[in-house]
Design a protein with these regions (language model features):
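Residue-level preference for the first positions of well-ordered beta-strands
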Residues: 2-4, 62-64
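A mobile, often basic/glycine-rich helix-loop segment
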Residues: 73-91
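Conserved substrate/cofactor phosphate-moiety recognition/catalytic segment
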Residues: 10-13, 17-62, 74
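Class I (Rossmann-like) S-adenosyl-L-methionine-dependent methyltransferase catalytic domain
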Residues: 4, 68, 116-122, 126
Length: 174
């Protein structure tokens, strides 16, 4: 059976680095869910299309999804609370669970703010205060919405861990 990994966390928390390392080790396919402003009104549909395509690929390859519904919950709350929330994260989560997907939370670490300033993503050009609110939003969601980490089977903080060690630990979960 092919594996499905879903990585969640703020910018500069190591998701994409971990995704590439998992891809290299498993020969998997990466799907990256960006949060472009043009997609805001149809974010649920956009994420549903990623899931549909990921499930088609999952028939033959491992799949790594670089952010999905948790990111949308956090970014919506911080960046667009004025917009109606049409997003149905429970539906997307149920689909991932149905395929035995492994959720991996990449937590903010002490060096995240310096990395963000150095590597600002042009598609996410937030000021530092907004970025701090986003990081806090992830911590709140992970601690309150999932107090027992009932959805996130593995958590990583690259401040003290190497990517290779994280990949090894993740793959031993299977």
């Amino acid at each position: 059976m092919k594996k499905l990994f879903v990585l969640e966390g703020p910018d500069c928390s190591g998701k994409s680095t971990l995704a590439r390392a998992l891809q290299k080790k498993t020969n998997g396919v990466i799907f990256h869910a960006s949060g472009n402003k043009l997609l805001w009104p149809v974010m649920h549909e956009y994420h549903q299309s990623i899931i549909d395509n990921a499930f088609a690929v999952l028939e033959h390859h491992d799949v790594i999804i670089d952010r999905l519904w948790l990111s949308e919950l956090v970014y919506h709350r911080v960046l667009r609370p004025h917009l109606e929330r049409r997003y149905q994260w429970e539906l997307l989560d149920a689909q991932i669970r149905g395929k035995q997907g492994l959720y991996i939370a990449c937590y903010p670490d002490p060096g995240i703010y310096a990395r963000y300033e150095k590597n600002i993503d042009p598609s996410h050009p937030y000021d530092m205060e907004t970025f701090k609110r986003i990081c806090t939003g992830y911590l709140i969601e992970l601690m309150t919405m999932h107090p027992r980490n009932d959805r996130f089977e593995y958590s990583v903080n690259f401040y003290n861990n190497s990517v290779d060690l994280a990949v090894k630990q993740i793959l031993t979960l299977w």
